[in-house]
């Protein structure tokens, strides 16, 4: 929380707001964008995981890794749909070069989709971007070259000795 941040961008989901509450409480400029929301897992959303759901998830993510990124979760979204709703938010963010240091808070699968887009990687490579809860991806954008550079990925050192249950 000691980083100099010009703006906070979050999804519209309450859990994301809770994750960056300390920054929000500092009265930093903050925008919520539903385009940054986590992928909709459809009829699997919010259910307690069980063996059947775990198998479904593993098979679905395998399908995506094989390049079938248009496949939706049952009654939910595909990675392509997530990316399409993220693109306008990225355009907004990049249109504001005066915001030198920004914090984007979002959930795991949506973050993986976003990172593939920012690094011009194929969407089916989204699982190459590992993540843990509350991890940090530190990126730098070069407006001249119009490209992102990875400074740190999947970093959790800022969490210190937080309990596992957080």
Summary of predicted features, one role per range:
Residues 1-61:
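Phosphate-coordination/substrate-recognition cap region in phosphate-metabolizing enzymes
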Residues 10-11, 84, 105-106:
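Short beta-strand scaffold positions
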Residues 59-81:
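Short glycine/proline- and acidic residue-enriched helix-loop micro-motifs
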């Amino acid at each position: 929380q000691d980083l100099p941040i010009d703006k906070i961008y979050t999804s519209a989901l309450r859990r994301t707001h809770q994750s960056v509450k300390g920054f929000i409480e500092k009265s930093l400029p903050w925008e919520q964008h539903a385009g940054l929301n986590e992928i909709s897992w459809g009829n699997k959303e919010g259910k307690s995981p069980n063996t059947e759901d775990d198998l479904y998830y593993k098979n679905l993510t395998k399908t995506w890794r094989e390049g079938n990124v248009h496949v939706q979760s049952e009654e939910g979204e595909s990675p392509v749909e997530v990316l399409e709703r993220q693109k306008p938010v990225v355009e907004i963010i990049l249109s504001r070069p005066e915001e030198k240091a920004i914090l984007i808070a979002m959930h795991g699968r949506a973050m993986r989709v976003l990172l593939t887009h920012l690094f011009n990687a194929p969407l089916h490579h989204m699982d190459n971007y590992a993540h843990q809860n509350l991890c940090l991806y530190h990126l730098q954008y070069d407006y001249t070259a119009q490209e992102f550079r990875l400074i740190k990925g999947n970093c959790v050192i800022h969490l210190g000795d937080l309990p596992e249950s957080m």
